[in-house]
């Protein structure tokens, strides 16, 4: 049996990945595998710019709406799901098209996973108690002592990742940085072609981000977050689902911490920061083909042709 093939379309938020993926679907018999951690959650449609019902009816989409906002998902599970789906889609005679910008998942898929321990509920409860008693700054200073490399790359207010780094250290006796630096060799079980939309005009990308954020507000984004708060009482601003850009800022606004204008400004700024991080990842990623989505209108055609050649169509 021939080795399965998958075509990956990467790019920062608001650069036109979904629109291009649908154009590819007009040309090739594809099924889309979402590479977007925000699209996993049910009930989070507007703020994630989730593909519409008609778009999902036009071409099959996978790894969308598979967990609730109070459930968790991991890079390890993505690798497992993506690998399985690639084989299943290929067996159906279709072409797997991986689309998104969650670069941590892509790195896990292409470079492999580190042997980090599973979360430990008892240890995490102990760390949460320490945070309540002594403050997050105490945990951050502890991390600086036991794993200065990880502490250096984390923000002092990143409660979730600080807790996870300490958890790894206490469970294994080794700092997380040592685990990450000791990454084993990894071989993909399928052939992968990696294309990316990378805009040279950063101002145009920022304009798209602002326009899309305002459109989300018109579509009822605040109401969507209010519904999440009512439906899932266990959700907090630190929940992984609410850490998605826009949602945390909306959550703070609904808590009364910001007025509407400040919320909008912070939401747009957070989305721009996400795009910046995605572009930084992309510039370090080996790519088979790169196109500027805001250039002359031919970039989409080039990537469609690249996909056709790759799949032998």
UniProtKB/Swiss-Prot annotation:
Q: Name one GO biological process term.
A: tRNA modification
UniProt keyword terms in alphabetical order: ATP-binding, Magnesium, Nucleotide-binding, Transferase, tRNA processing
Keyword Hydrolase annotated:
no
- EC numbers: 2.5.1.75
Q: Cross-referenced InterPro entries, in alphabetical order? A: Dimethylallyltransferase (IPR039657), IPT (IPR018022), P-loop_NTPase (IPR027417)
Enumerate the residues marked as the site Interaction with substrate tRNA.
102, 124
**Xref: Gene3D superfamilies:** 1.10.20.140, P-loop containing nucleotide triphosphate hydrolases
User: Which GO terms fall under molecular function for this chain's record?
Assistant: ATP binding; tRNA dimethylallyltransferase activity
* Binding residues for ATP: 11-18
Protein family (similarity comment): Belongs to the IPP transferase family.
| Designated name of the protein | tRNA dimethylallyltransferase
**Species of the source:** Neisseria gonorrhoeae (strain NCCP11945)
């Amino acid at each position: 049996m021939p080795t399965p093939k998958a075509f990956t379309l990467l790019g920062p938020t608001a650069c036109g990945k979904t629109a291009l993926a649908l154009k590819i679907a007009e040309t090739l018999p594809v099924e889309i595998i979402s590479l977007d951690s925000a699209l996993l959650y049910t009930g989070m449609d507007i703020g994630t710019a989730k593909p519409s019902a008609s778009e999902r009816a036009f071409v099959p989409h996978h790894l969308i709406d598979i967990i609730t906002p109070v459930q968790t998902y991991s890079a390890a599970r993505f690798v497992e799901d993506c690998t399985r789906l690639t084989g299943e889609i290929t067996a159906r005679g279709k072409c797997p098209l991986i689309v998104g910008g969650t670069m941590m998942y892509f790195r896990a898929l292409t470079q492999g996973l580190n042997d980090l321990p599973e979360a430990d509920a008892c240890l995490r409860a102990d760390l949460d108690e320490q945070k309540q008693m002594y403050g997050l700054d105490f945990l951050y200073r502890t991390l600086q002592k036991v794993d200065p490399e990880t502490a250096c790359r984390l923000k002092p207010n990143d409660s979730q990742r600080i807790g996870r780094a300490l958890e790894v250290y206490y469970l294994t006796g080794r700092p997380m940085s040592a685990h990450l630096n000791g990454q084993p060799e990894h071989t993909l079980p399928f052939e992968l072609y990696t294309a990316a939309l990378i805009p040279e005009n950063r101002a145009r990308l920022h304009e798209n981000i602002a326009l899309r954020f305002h459109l989300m507000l018109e579509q009822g984004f605040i109401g969507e977050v209010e519904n999440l708060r009512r439906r899932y009482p266990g959700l907090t601003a630190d929940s992984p689902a609410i850490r998605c850009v826009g949602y945390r800022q909306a959550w703070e606004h609904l808590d009364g911490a910001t007025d509407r204008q400040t919320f909008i400004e912070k939401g747009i700024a957070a989305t721009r920061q996400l795009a910046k991080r995605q572009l930084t990842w992309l510039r370090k990623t080996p790519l088979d083909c790169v196109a500027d989505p805001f250039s002359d209108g031919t970039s989409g055609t080039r990537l469609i042709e690249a996909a056709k050649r790759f799949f032998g169509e």
